[in-house]
From Swiss-Prot:
The gene is kup. GO terms for molecular function: potassium ion transmembrane transporter activity; symporter activity. It catalyses: K(+)(in) + H(+)(in) = K(+)(out) + H(+)(out). Transport of potassium into the cell. Likely operates as a K(+):H(+) symporter. It comes from the Bacteria. This is Probable potassium transport system protein Kup. HAMAP family: Kup (MF_01522). The chain crosses the membrane at residues 9-29, 52-72, 101-121, 137-157, 169-189, 213-233, 247-267, 287-309, 337-357, 363-383, 396-416, 419-439. It is a multi-pass membrane protein. Its main location: membrane. The keyword Membrane applies. Keywords: Cell inner membrane, Cell membrane, Ion transport, Membrane, Potassium, Potassium transport, Symport, Transmembrane, Transmembrane helix, Transport. It is found in: Cell inner membrane. Belongs to the HAK/KUP transporter (TC 2.A.72) family.
Length: 622
């Protein structure tokens, strides 16, 4: 039983409010303000205000409530979600060519997520602290340094984990949503006719009147649904129903009340377009709202940082990224991890973004492309799963696909036009991450194929050992092997150069399945190949961390004990050399070689004692 099933529904729902809805829950800070930004240039008339409110309302209903909560959340891999999970599910029952296309789409979506993660903390924290200028313009020069200080503190505390303060996320975000709803409801009460914007007629009329400008304004409307991917990505932590319950009972009502409250305020006071969120609050409440909004944006930023840690671990375990040092920050929650390299690279990127863009308005143009690009990819992958995995009729899937793309594609295109205004940032970051993941996966495949060609078939080795009976030395030799085909090169080198073998030889392979967790009883498989040669296959899910001590413990339970003092681990250490291929292939090989040199060594990844490791070198052209 999962952790979220063991806890009470109210507790899990409260936790989901604190993590899942942090990003989308802080969107009212900047969304409506950006709808009236100078580059759009629309006046705050009744038709325009109603048009924007209607678009925001139907975006929250159709994209979040219908597409994600009713459709996409059905596509779980044993309870887990996320873009890479969706990619794995979509590729299970399709043809080889289709699988390749889906793989590329999934990696592009993963790259977009990394791009979005860089922007979210910067955008959120800046927009919260900009409330200081509403309280008093004299504090405006301090917004940027305070934002840098807040973000620095956020990334510094990552190594300590969020176990203790994480318990406050839910209550703080609940207070945040209560404040959103209350301020919005008070404003609506003063101008209740604003509720007429619930009618989609106003959205349609908005497009008929303003045409091209209305289309471009979708780039601001989409800010209302940024963070929607978290609903799917965090499904494994909280479960489907608590996420749905938190949305329909807390997040959605509060967001709608606040957006419509901002609209009512602008209709009665057009000057409020400068910062309608903070101007909703009475003057005495502005400072407390700045503090609360800063706390909410820090929580939202923490959620996406934790999300990128989780995605990175999943990508490493599935073979899309090189090995990294992954630290567990909680003895209770396996999902609470810290990846130092990712944390500090992300911090540097966020800092550069904050210093470069300086204001949330400047960042708004950069925000939408990654979000809407991921939305389009999610629609395609989810519909593929619906047809091939769930056996939904092709006609039904086509109707769903076309209907969802009619929403996603216009939102994406409206953001593409903002490419040179800042949209290049997530595209560039996404392209870099896609190139890294695709290169690592492809070049690893080529490397393993090359090593396989250089190896000896398992049957030939066993026959040779039984026939020639080389000299035996006491102890156990464990040879770590990447595949179950052929003999590890370290074993061949040891035999050819030292002409000896250990009394007991174990070929050990660690495999990762595209499921989050593997049944503990299925972790270890032991097979005898000859009287003194054994093969051990250790299988894990992509959310599990392999550990050689656990392998030993499970082997002992199956009757095969190991004495660490008399056991040596032999590893192949490849020296990679670029081959004479095309220029593009050589560039990929150079990137792969650099990634390999900086990746975590296998013995460190599976926690092999350093004093029991023997490395055997081999040169391979890639």
């Amino acid at each position: 039983m999962d952790a979220h099933q063991k806890q009470s529904l109210p507790a899990v729902t409260l936790a989901a409010i604190g993590v899942v809805y942090g990003d989308i829950g802080t969107s009212p800070l900047y969304t409506f303000k950006e709808c009236f930004s100078p580059h759009i240039g629309l006046p705050p008339t009744q038709q325009v205000v109603y048009g924007f409110l209607s678009l925001i309302f139907w975006a929250l209903i159709l994209v979040v409530s219908v597409k994600y909560l009713a459709f996409v959340l059905r596509a779980d891999n044993r309870g887990e979600g996320g873009i890479l999970t969706l990619m794995s599910l979509a590729g299970r029952n399709t043809y080889a060519g289709t699988t390749t296309v889906l793989l590329v789409l999934g990696l592009i979506g993963g790259g977009f997520f990394y791009g979005e993660v860089v922007i979210t903390p910067a955008m959120s924290v800046l927009s919260a602290l900009e409330g200081l200028s509403v309280a008093t313009p004299a504090l405006t020069p301090y917004i940027l340094p305070v934002a840098i200080a807040v973000l620095t503190a956020l990334f510094v505390i990552q190594k300590h984990g969020t176990g203790s303060v994480g318990k406050l996320f839910g209550p703080v975000m609940l207070l945040w949503f209560f404040s959103l709803g209350t301020l919005g409801a008070i404003s609506i009460f003063k101008n209740p006719q604003v509720l007429a914007a619930l009618n989609p007629h106003w959205a349609i009329q908005f497009f008929l009147t303003y045409k091209t400008v209305a289309f471009f304004s979708l780039g601001s409307v989409v800010l209302a649904i940024t963070g929607v991917e978290a609903l799917y990505a965090d499904m494994g932590h909280f479960g489907k129903f608590p996420i749905q319950l938190a949305w329909f009972t807390v997040a959605l009502p509060a967001l709608l009340l606040n957006y419509f409250g901002q609209g009512a305020l602008i209709l009665s006071n057009p000057e409020a377009i400068a910062n309608p969120f903070f101007m909703l609050a009475p003057e005495w409440l502005v400072f407390p709202m700045v503090i609360l909004s800063t706390m909410a944006t820090v929580i939202a930023s923490q959620a996406v940082i934790s999300g990128v840690f989780s995605l990175t671990r999943q990508a490493v375990r599935l073979g899309y990224l090189p090995g990294m040092n992954i630290l567990h920050t909680s003895e209770v929650e396996a999902g609470q991890i810290y990846i130092p390299f990712v944390n500090w690279m992300l911090y540097i990127a966020v800092l550069i973004v904050v210093v470069t863009f300086r204001e949330s308005t400047n960042l708004a143009a950069a925000y939408g492309i990654a979000v809407t690009g991921t939305m389009v990819i999610t629609t395609i992958l989810a519909c593929t799963v619906a047809h091939y995995n769930w056996d939904w009729p092709r006609r039904v899937v086509k109707i769903i696909l076309i209907s969802l793309l009619l929403i996603d594609v216009p939102l994406f295109l409206a953001n593409v036009v903002k490419f040179f205004a800042g949209g290049w940032l997530p595209v560039m970051l996404g392209a870099i991450m896609f190139m890294v993941m695709a290169t690592w996966k492809w070049e690893r495949f080529l490397l393993l194929r090359q090593l396989s060609r250089m190896s000896m078939p398992l049957e030939s080795f066993v026959a040779m050992v039984e026939k020639e009976t080389p000299q035996k030395v006491p102890g156990t030799a464990i040879y770590l092997s990447r595949t179950q085909q052929g003999i590890p090169h370290a074993l061949l080198h040891n035999l050819n150069h030292n002409h000896v073998l250990h009394e007991r030889i174990v070929l050990m392979t660690f495999r990762t399945q595209d499921v989050p967790y593997v049944d503990p009883d299925q972790h270890i498989e032991i097979k005898s190949l000859s009287p003194n040669v054994w093969r051990i296959s250790a299988t894990y899910g992509f959310h599990e961390t392999p550990d050689v001590y656990e392998v030993f413990r499970r082997c002992a339970m199956k009757g095969m004990a190991f004495n660490l003092n008399t056991t040596s681990f032999f590893l192949s250490r490849e020296t990679l050399l670029p081959s004479h291929r095309s220029i593009l292939a050589r560039l990929r090989a150079a990137l792969f070689i650099w990634l390999s040199k900086n990746s975590l060594r296998t013995n460190d990844f599976i926690h092999v004692p350093a004093d029991r490791v023997v490395e055997m070198g081999v040169q391979v052209e890639v």
